[in-house]
């Protein structure tokens, strides 16, 4: 069990299974969730993004959607442990099943930390559960974007974390599915290295206007977390 150091929230995770990384923390921080918003988190894993959003905002409800049953079970146990079951729920569904997505009441915000790697690229993790989390096995990038559009109310927004080498694909597929890119932020390991994470906000049926946010640098010159990251973790 991991302590998020946020309102006493703890998240149940397996030591030898998929564990959340800084990308999920960055995504939860990047998402603009307003008081009373209803939120869906796709590819939710063990629920780190919903739990951070619950701790930092006054969202009225947060639903995590995850295809792997054991992760859903752990996430719901975490919700009960933190006495957040009235605010957060996790359901085991396939986001490519658009009929199911259409049955979910439309929301103000969708967040997603999808598999980054194409199925036929790199070495596929021998553990199926790890591979599903990292490779486009159960869904691809367009499936994710279509699900986001299906879940969003008119003019409401999605937030995604991904890899910069897929940015052209992300923007192309967002526009194909009438989600307009509105805000992009690059994340670099440090000031000397190229970005390895991209955060992007899109608006369903939005007008054309794109804002570039200042970059985030994860580590400082001494090898410790930067002031930006310390602030995101609530330590500054």
Regions found by a protein language model. Name each.
Residues 1-34:
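Class I SAM-dependent transferase core
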Residues 114-143:
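Mobile active-site "lid"/loop adjacent to the S-adenosyl-L-methionine
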Residues 10, 138-188, 193-195:
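Conserved Class I SAM-dependent methyltransferase catalytic core
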Residues 9, 37, 60, 86-88, ...:
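A structural micro-motif
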Residues 192-236:
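SAM/dcSAM-binding transferase cores
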Residues 18-20, 43-46, 192:
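Short glycine/threonine-rich catalytic loop with a Thr-x-Gly-x-Asp
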Residues 30-123, 146:
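Conserved SAM/SAH cofactor-binding pocket of Class I
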